[in-house]
Amino acid sequence: MIYLHAIDPIAFSLGPVKVHWYGLMYLAGFGAAWCLGRQRIQAGRLLGVNIDGFSDLLFYAMMGVVLGGRVGYMLFYAFHDFLQEPLLLFRVWEGGMSFHGGLIGVLLAVAWWSRRQRMHMFDVVDFCAPLVPVGLGFGRLGNFIGGELWGKLTHNGWGVIFPRAPLSDVPAGQLAMQDVMNFVQIQEHYAAGLLGHYARHPSQLYEAFLEGLVMFIVLWLFSRKLRPRYAVSGLFALLYGVFRFLVEFVRMPDNGVYVAFGWLTRGQILSLPLIVIGLFLFWLSCRSPVLQPVPAPEVAK
């Protein structure tokens, strides 16, 4: 059944401060990472690090996600706007985060933390990789609740009508449904069955399922058995790259513009290196040691 998106992106207000569901999804993702990471720490899966040390790591990873995600969005998707108005970088409440930028930010944070602790960076990345998909899933749910990053038009029965989406897939920048009708009129037309041809793929939910649920199950089960260094990180990069590349075929390109060939999106271009890196890390893992778990120490590193 076709669904009309009518979810308020604002969860609640505290005086003049409006708390968005998207921000709450970030908090849920970090909370889940904390709980799952705590379990792995207690199992001795990050050598020489206890709960306090993991808390320190998670704090820097959170900073990397937020800062890297915002900077990445400006560089990858809104560079022209950033050049015109550099202060856009700090207006995070207006939205705009990039997974690929967040990934770079996390890797830089992990590299710094690992060096400070005199640990191999990829031992830490392998530990963290199974914790990430839950956060990705929550983030994509936040995108859906916010009615953003929608998919292309579809005739499938599970399509979603997004009032903020353009009335057509092309050309970019045209009027959205909410620009020509108020929400009461949209609801009346929806009830009369007149809006079915404006339904779109809920690509946010596709990504929540693949990048969130499926990746979590696969990585969690894969990492339960001791694996050589680089293997878990390689599987994460490979799965995300493949899933994101595939979903981009039914997701509207950023700003409605394809980068090449009339179908290749910026998200696909940014995901291709992840596939290559994933395969390379798998190759490296065949030549690397398998680290045995060691109970967490009493004192954090």
From Swiss-Prot:
One of its GO terms (biological process) is lipoprotein biosynthetic process. PROSITE patterns: LGT. It is an enzyme of class 2 (transferase). Catalyzes the transfer of the diacylglyceryl group from phosphatidylglycerol to the sulfhydryl group of the N-terminal cysteine of a prolipoprotein, the first step in the formation of mature lipoproteins. InterPro entries: Lgt. Its main location: membrane. It is found in: Cell inner membrane. It is a multi-pass membrane protein. A 1,2-diacyl-sn-glycero-3-phospho-(1'-sn-glycerol) binds at residue 140. Its EC number is 2.5.1.145. Belongs to the Lgt family. GO terms for cellular component: plasma membrane. Keywords: Cell inner membrane, Cell membrane, Membrane, Transferase, Transmembrane, Transmembrane helix. Pathway: Protein modification; lipoprotein biosynthesis (diacylglyceryl transfer). The gene is lgt. The chain crosses the membrane at residues 10-30, 57-77, 92-112, 119-139, 202-222, 230-250, 264-284. This is Phosphatidylglycerol--prolipoprotein diacylglyceryl transferase.
